[in-house]
Amino acid sequence: MNHLTLRGTHREMGFQWGARLAERGLRLLDHVPFFLTAERRAFAAACHPAYARHFPAALEELEGLAAGQNCRQEDLETVLFTTYALPPACGCSCLAVSNGNGVFFGRNSDFLTALEPDYTHVTYGFSDRAIPFTGNTTSFVQMEDAVNARGLAIGLTSVYTPRPRPGLNAGMVLRLLAETCAAVPEALDRLRVLPLASCQTLTLADAAGDIAVAECSPEGMRVERPGPAGPFICAANLFHSDLAVPLPPGPFSGPLMQGSSQ
């Protein structure tokens, strides 16, 4: 696993990340495990306005990353904005336990295992108002799990998305919550108003001992809390709520491995 510590503005940290990889002769776009098809490019372009409205800092970081890698920002956006909405596979699992004596939070990452040598642990120290956090990613910018300086921990699992819609996907939503929210209720409130591109679960835990699983899809969100079985929650690659009711495929859910290449 790679380890990075980044400090500065979002754009500065994006440039740091891209430039450090470039110094080692590594190009992010050479390691993408799927083709950047016309379908993916169209979906990413449709998602761009949602990021400009709800998470403009991510676009600034991607601008810096593209400069550091000497590549097109559009190509990086195509990778990131479609990874969970149009996934090549689903993976990961999470759990959290809160028993009054503390919180235990765990996550297993088995998404895109072909990229395992490139997995990265990142610590972000922002020079603006964003909350510092440390997290893990199989790619770049988006995070699969994170713990921030306010004590909020979040982990995702991917769920098949029958009808993707333009919006923010799992890893980017998690990243946004990690740098803007201090507790589970605040994160859930923020999540309810975001346009979502993909289906996913988000397992959340905070310093007060509050834990929850948010089952999220473009159609809505359900929150699961600890039940009679004990003070724990868990999630894998499916929903337990009625969000799991099958839907017919949408316009962006066709074959993804065909068409134009990178």
Roles of regions detected by a PLM:
Residues 74-95:
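Short, glycine/charge-rich beta-strand/loop segments that flank catalytic centers
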Residues 1-71, 82, 99-104, 108-262:
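C-terminal, well-structured catalytic/ligand-binding subdomain of enzymes
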